[in-house]
């Protein structure tokens, strides 16, 4: 075995504004399995997490309940920990981002970034609730969709037609908090200059720290150009005040990942561990983040950029997983498939049934996984009970009934028939299964383990110990003793391989077999001669389909959202739209200044790709009496062939600019934040090339 590795593992921090549901549990079960496997291998592996406790939703929910935010997050922390414990998620530390440890690290990192010139303040314009006297996040503004005119749509996207937009695009907007019409108000915000970290991030995202599909996804952001990141919010806000900026608070997505450091700092202080050994720039420890693919932007761009430029180490790997569907569809309250962890446990379902089923579906990619409730019942009953548990239940009773629970037998019968060949096969599979666990291909591990279980069951079916037990001669008793001993050794090996997934069942098996806690290395040994076992007790029951029906019924709710409570914010939407906040109007200029700009109608005579350029298209523009060549940064939004023949507006008297790819003789006008959201301006019908725009 290789020397022990020093490993720190995190899962994304659940938001302290709601219950844990089965979708959340995909990630925590995935992480817990991986951590348990590493610990079984003898590695020094620490697993930390925390509640994500800051932000406007926390503040407003606490206000609605008539309690302080601190009281709310303390209660939710207890609920989350209860649910995780119920599903056997075993953290080394489960903490809160609302801690002095996280506050100190946030202030430290902010100060280091500021010292390096990566923090900038600037005025922005946002919607403000004049009744509550607070700036409103996108999801706390509703109005009429500017495209399909659906009523009561959120401030960042329409759930009817799917259009995304800025809150200021809404028709007749109103505050979800007070119902008042919001007004635009200017405020100074603090920005992290993420764009200046682009070259580092391009290298880091291609370094092997990400899954291939994750790295490819991030390429889209690089092509669009990285925007500076707004890291501040205005009072009133529940969070950490920015040092030297009274009334300004760190945005929740700045201190949330720093919560990993805060939780680990708390663990270090309690156990006497060296924090710097894990987080310093040249650390030899391994750092792994398990996350959902919806927060990839924050963890794979914002977070490593912050760490790198504040003098800390970056993650060894980031493992992103897909979303959970139930019966092939999004979880639904009306269909009863938006199932909370608490409800699952209260309905009496075994948490290890779900751990096993998720393991059957999980792999090392970002693919979504589906919880088919019918398949869930069938697979657990067939695999766990019908194959695995069945092995012990069909043989253990004979050992205690006829042999006083003793397993002191040879592995070969008097007539020379060897029965230990299957033991070698199972032992030799340890490294293959180990590789699957390490790469998070749990579905492959399960497939292999169940193939081995099938072979063991074939062995038992061929030997028929229940038939042998009916015969009372000495040969039959000896044969029965060997068959049972072999079978229980095989059962023990299968238990080792399943232990990361089924820790409580493995504990029960350890008690039944009277053995210490199983490690991965134990796959190379057998139960010793003369070993005694306890009486067999039933290890697991089958799922009754009626239990699942009752679970669904218990979770069936109306689709109508709770009044005044917006749906949880989408980190993806926030990442894509935060730069769409209305920018302040530029400095006033005179009419004489504006008159200097010669705007003309131009027809795009030709458009083509520019070899070696990620963002540019080469446009040949017809101005009526002459043609111009312009290099325009619109490649991410337009295919060249779709532009040919189109009319647009250009700045005709802009000084020619010599570029790497040629001379650009003007500028076309477009709106939008960039990336795929670039909108080329077009004149109304009747305009002709060369006409002056007045």
UniProtKB/Swiss-Prot annotation:
GO cellular component terms listed in the entry, alphabetical order: cytosol
Coiled coil, from the record: none
Molecular function per GO: ATP binding; metal ion binding; methionine-tRNA ligase activity; tRNA binding
Keyword annotations of the record: Aminoacyl-tRNA synthetase, ATP-binding, Cytoplasm, Ligase, Metal-binding, Nucleotide-binding, Protein biosynthesis, RNA-binding, tRNA-binding, Zinc
Superkingdom of origin organism: Bacteria
UniProt-recorded name of the protein: Methionine--tRNA ligase
Gene encoding the protein: metG
InterPro entries noted in UniProt: aa-tRNA-synth_I_CS, Anticodon_Met, Met-tRNA-synth_bsu_C, Met-tRNA_ligase_1, Met-tRNA_synth, Methionyl/Leucyl_tRNA_Synth, MetRS_core, MetRS_Zn
Disordered: annotated span: 558-579
Pfam family, one: Anticodon_3
Any single biological process term in GO: methionyl-tRNA aminoacylation
Residue intervals of the tRNA-binding domain: 593-694
Primary role: Is required not only for elongation of protein synthesis but also for the initiation of all mRNA translation through initiator tRNA(fMet) aminoacylation.
First-tier enzyme category under EC: ligase
């Amino acid at each position: 075995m290789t020397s022990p590795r020093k490993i720190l593992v995190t899962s994304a921090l659940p938001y302290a504004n709601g219950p844990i549901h089965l979708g959340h549990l995909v990630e925590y079960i995935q992480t817990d399995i991986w951590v348990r496997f590493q610990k079984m291998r003898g590695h020094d592996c620490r697993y930390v997490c925390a509640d994500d406790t800051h932000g406007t939703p926390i503040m407003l929910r606490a206000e609605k309940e008539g309690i302080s935010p601190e009281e709310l997050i303390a209660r939710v922390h207890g609920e989350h920990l209860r649910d995780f414990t119920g599903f056997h998620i075993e953290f080394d530390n489960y903490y809160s981002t609302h801690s002095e440890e996280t506050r100190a690290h946030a202030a430290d990192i902010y100060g280091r970034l500021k010292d390096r010139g990566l923090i900038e303040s600037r005025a922005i314009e946002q919607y403000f609730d004049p009744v509550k006297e607070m700036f409103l996040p996108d999801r706390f503004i509703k109005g009429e969709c500017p495209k399909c005119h659906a009523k009561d749509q959120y401030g960042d996207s329409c759930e009817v037609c799917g259009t995304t937009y800025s809150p200021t695009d809404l028709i007749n907007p109103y505050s979800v908090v007070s119902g008042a019409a919001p007004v635009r108000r200017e405020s100074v915000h603090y920005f992290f200059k993420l764009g200046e970290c682009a070259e580092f991030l391009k290298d880091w995202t291609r370094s092997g720290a990400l899954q291939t599909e994750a790295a490819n996804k991030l390429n889209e952001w690089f092509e669009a150009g990285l925007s500076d990141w707004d890291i501040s919010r205005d009072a009133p806000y529940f969070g950490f005040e920015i040092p030297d900026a009274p009334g300004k608070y760190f945005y929740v997505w700045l201190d949330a990942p720093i919560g990993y450091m805060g939780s680990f700092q708390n663990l270090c202080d309690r156990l006497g561990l060296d924090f710097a050994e894990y987080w310093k720039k040249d650390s030899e420890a391994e750092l792994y983040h398990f996350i959902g693919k919806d927060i990839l932007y924050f963890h794979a761009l914002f977070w490593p950029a912050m760490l790198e430029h504040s003098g800390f180490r970056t993650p060894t790997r980031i493992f992103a997983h897909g979303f959970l569907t139930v019966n092939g569809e999004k979880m639904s309250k009306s269909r009863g498939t938006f199932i909370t962890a608490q409800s699952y446990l209260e309905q009496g379902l075994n948490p290890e049934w779900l751990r096993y089923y998720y393991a059957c579906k999980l792999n090392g990619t970002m693919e979504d996984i589906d919880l088919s409730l019918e398949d869930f019942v069938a697979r657990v009953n067939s695999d766990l009970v019908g194959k695995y548990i069945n092995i012990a239940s069909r043989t253990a009773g004979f050992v205690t009934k006829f042999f006083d629970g003793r397993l002191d037998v040879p592995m070969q019968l008097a007539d020379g028939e060897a029965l230990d060949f299957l033991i070698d096969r199972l032992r030799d599979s340890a490294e293959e299964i180990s590789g699957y666990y390490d790469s998070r291909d749990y579905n492959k591990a399960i497939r292999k383990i169940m193939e081995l279980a099938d072979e063991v069951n074939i062995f038992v079916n061929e030997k028929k110990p229940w038939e042998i037990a009916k015969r009372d001669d000495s040969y039959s008793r000896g044969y029965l003793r060997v068959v049972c001993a072999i079978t229980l050794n095989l059962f023990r090996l299968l238990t080792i391989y399943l232990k990361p997934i089924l820790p409580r069942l493995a504990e029960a098996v350890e008690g039944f077999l009277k053995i210490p806690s199983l490690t991965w290395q134990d796959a190379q040994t057998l139960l010793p001669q003369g070993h005694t076992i306890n009486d067999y007790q039933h290890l697991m029951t089958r799922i009754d389909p009626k239990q699942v029906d009752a679970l669904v019924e218990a979770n069936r709710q109306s689709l109508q959202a709770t009044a005044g409570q917006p749906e949880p914010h989408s980190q993806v939407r926030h990442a894509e739209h935060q730069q769409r906040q209305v920018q302040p109007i530029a400095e006033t200029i005179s009419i004489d200044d504006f008159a200097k700009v010669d705007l003309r109608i131009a027809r795009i005579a030709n458009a083509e790709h520019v070899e070696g350029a990620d963002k540019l298209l080469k446009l040949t523009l017809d101005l009526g009496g002459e043609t111009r060549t312009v290099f325009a940064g619109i490649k991410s939004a337009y295919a060249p062939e779709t532009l040919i023949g189109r009319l647009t507006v250009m700045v005709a008297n802009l000084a020619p600019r010599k570029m790497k790819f040629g001379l650009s003789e003007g500028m076309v006008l477009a709106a939008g934040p960039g990336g795929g959201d670039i909108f080329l301006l077009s004149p109304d019908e009747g305009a002709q090339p060369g006409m002056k725009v007045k």
